[in-house]
Curated annotation (Swiss-Prot):
InterPro entries: SAM-dependent_MTases_sf, UbiE/COQ5_MeTrFase, UbiE/COQ5_MeTrFase_CS
Enzyme Commission designation: 2.1.1.163, 2.1.1.201
SUPFAM superfamilies hit by this protein: S-adenosyl-L-methionine-dependent methyltransferases (SSF53335)
Gene that produces this protein: ubiE
Catalysed reactions, semicolon-separated: a 2-demethylmenaquinol + S-adenosyl-L-methionine = a menaquinol + S-adenosyl-L-homocysteine + H(+); a 2-methoxy-6-(all-trans-polyprenyl)benzene-1,4-diol + S-adenosyl-L-methionine = a 5-methoxy-2-methyl-3-(all-trans-polyprenyl)benzene-1,4-diol + S-adenosyl-L-homocysteine + H(+)
Protein name (Swiss-Prot/TrEMBL): Ubiquinone/menaquinone biosynthesis C-methyltransferase UbiE
Protein function: Methyltransferase required for the conversion of demethylmenaquinol (DMKH2) to menaquinol (MKH2) and the conversion of 2-polyprenyl-6-methoxy-1,4-benzoquinol (DDMQH2) to 2-polyprenyl-3-methyl-6-methoxy-1,4-benzoquinol (DMQH2).
Pathway: Quinol/quinone metabolism; menaquinone biosynthesis; menaquinol from 1,4-dihydroxy-2-naphthoate: step 2/2; Cofactor biosynthesis; ubiquinone biosynthesis
PROSITE patterns noted in UniProt: SAM_MT_UBIE, UBIE_1
GO molecular function: 2-methoxy-6-polyprenyl-1,4-benzoquinol methyltransferase activity; demethylmenaquinone methyltransferase activity
EC class name: transferase
Residues annotated as binding S-adenosyl-L-methionine: 69, 90, 116-117
Pfam families in the record: Ubie_methyltran
Amino acid sequence: MSKTHFGFESVEETEKAKKVAGVFHSVASNYDLMNDLMSAGMHRAWKAFTIAQANVRPGFKVLDIAAGTGDLTRAFAKAAGPTGEVWHTDINESMLRVGRDRLLDKGVVTPSLLCDAEKLPFPNNYFDVVTVAFGLRNMTHKDAALAEMRRVAKPGGRVMVLEFSKVWEPLKKAYDLYSFKVLPWLGDRFAKDADSYRYLAESIRMHPDQDTLKTMMEQAGLDAVKYYNLSGGVVALHVGSKY
């Protein structure tokens, strides 16, 4: 059986899926609060930039993968309007449930679906925009997931990946201190769960850097791939087109 990584730990591929599921079952109820605390609210700016770059218009079909608590889904549903079609999807039932409930609380009625990004249950050439925010690094077969995202995008459509990335070198020492000391402390203090936030820090370090992910998207068949560094490379938004 093939090995992969869960944070810094080497595990069987099937074990990683179970461990990642356990992390997100654990953090689901505190997810938005912890995002605000960990990023000092910056995650809202990163998502706002992604929403602006997506440029969703009335009538668009949009797939939001690893959509979690539904921040992007809600914005896309508003932009696509009643003639559009926006799917809120996640592989984790706890995250999907929290997101679905919050969307309904905001008056957003849109389909929520439990699904695996590596085996998307959608037809070829269907979506104008496909997005995944802070989800790709948790996927076991990132290449398969990227290929699936391209498959379901329409010709002329775009695939967008918002993810933690490699910080600029002058920031690295302070960022490492924050990641491996402060994040687990915040997790323990506010969510009673240091281990899940230790995994977060480790998973970020194991994720491909900006240029490597760009190459992976090109190898998945996407064209004109580019990326935007945000907050000194703490996060990067990659955008690829399907021609």
